[in-house]
């Protein structure tokens, strides 16, 4: 798929995410065994876990938004990754949006994050823990140059490379989305150990955070996984295509009506939203 087509799909997804959503009315996880249902951009979750807000290894940002819910696998991944980072003396992991208590569509900001298997993680690792005020109104660190062609050398740190690599090497991770310039820098820094780069995918924005996505849990029978990323490290022509100018005639698509929910998600809404 060429970059222009991908751009159109991203714009369509964004317009869907801005539609009104009833999912915010569900304020607590739906009881039951953990089940991720549907796809990452059209789904929900039963039996979500709450990420503990207090941890010595990570801090949760924007807790007032209450987007710190996810499948138990996601909670365990965050705890596992942040513990590794802490043990290596790299700093504190900053956790952004996961999902809402029952997953589902946001009213803006995300087209995915619907099945409890996605998390945004800042690409900075402070040595000093942030204050409550900093966590509520976090200042993102833009690692990408103004022209989007490369990372800012004074901001790019070996610890950030290691953070992304550790996440990509996790057994449950299927994709990590970062800005193309960040992917390019990872390709330059990786050396001969490159298998993990396959999971790191270039995507629009993502200049200050990585978006980590887990594979569908084996016992979530209604969860829809994406196809695996293409073979190889993704550092060749596909990556370079992201730096080409947009083709003439590219226009913004009309807003798209959200697709029907999976039946189990619709039934969940019908039961829990008045």
Curated annotation (Swiss-Prot):
SUPFAM superfamilies: Hedgehog/DD-peptidase. Disulfide bonds join 44-265, 187-235, 216-223. Zn(2+) 1 binds at residues 110, 113, 120, 211. It is found in: Periplasm. This is Penicillin-insensitive murein endopeptidase. Its cofactor is Zn(2+). Murein endopeptidase that cleaves the D-alanyl-meso-2,6-diamino-pimelyl amide bond that connects peptidoglycan strands. Likely plays a role in the removal of murein from the sacculus. One of its GO terms (biological process) is peptidoglycan metabolic process. Keywords: Disulfide bond, Hydrolase, Metal-binding, Metalloprotease, Periplasm, Protease, Signal, Zinc. GO terms for cellular component: outer membrane-bounded periplasmic space. Gene3D superfamilies: 3.30.1380.10. Zn(2+) 2 binds at residues 147, 150. Belongs to the peptidase M74 family. Residues 1-19 form the signal peptide. Dimer. Binds 2 Zn(2+) ions per subunit. Zn(2+) ion 1 is bound in the active site. Zn(2+) ion 2 is bound at the dimer interface by residues from both subunits. Residues 227-274 are annotated as: Disordered. The gene is mepA. InterPro entries: Hedgehog_sig/DD-Pept_Zn-bd_sf, Peptidase_M74. It comes from the Bacteria. GO terms for molecular function: metal ion binding; metalloendopeptidase activity; serine-type endopeptidase activity. Its EC number is 3.4.24.-.
């Amino acid at each position: 798929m060429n970059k222009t087509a991908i751009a159109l799909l991203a714009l369509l997804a964004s317009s869907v995410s801005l539609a009104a959503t009833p999912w915010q009315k569900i304020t607590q996880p739906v009881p039951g065994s953990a089940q991720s249902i549907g796809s990452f951009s059209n789904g929900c979750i039963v039996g979500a876990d709450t990420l503990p807000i207090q941890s010595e290894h990570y801090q949760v940002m924007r807790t007032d938004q209450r987007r710190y819910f996810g499948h138990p696998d996601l909670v365990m991944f965050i705890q596992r990754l942040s513990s590794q980072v802490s043990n290596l003396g790299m700093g504190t992991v900053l956790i952004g949006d996961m999902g809402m208590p029952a997953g589902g569509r946001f009213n803006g900001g995300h087209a995915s994050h619907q099945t409890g298997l996605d998390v945004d993680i800042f690409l900075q690792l402070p040595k000093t823990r942030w204050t409550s005020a900093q966590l509520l109104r976090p200042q993102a660190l833009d690692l990408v140059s103004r022209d989007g062609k490369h990372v800012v050398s004074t901001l790019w740190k070996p610890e950030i490379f290691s953070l992304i690599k550790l996440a990509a090497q996790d057994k449950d991770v299927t994709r990590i989305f970062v800005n193309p310039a960040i992917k390019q820098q990872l390709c330059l820094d990786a050396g001969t150990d490159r298998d993990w780069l396959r999971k790191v995918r270039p995507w629009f924005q993502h200049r200050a955070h990585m978006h980590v996505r887990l594979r569908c849990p084996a016992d979530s029978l209604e969860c829809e996984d994406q196809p695996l990323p293409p073979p190889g490290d993704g550092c060749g022509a596909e990556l370079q295509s992201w730096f080409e100018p947009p083709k003439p005639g590219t226009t913004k698509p009309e807003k798209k009506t959200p697709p029907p929910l999976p039946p189990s998600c619709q039934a969940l809404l019908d039961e829990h939203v008045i």
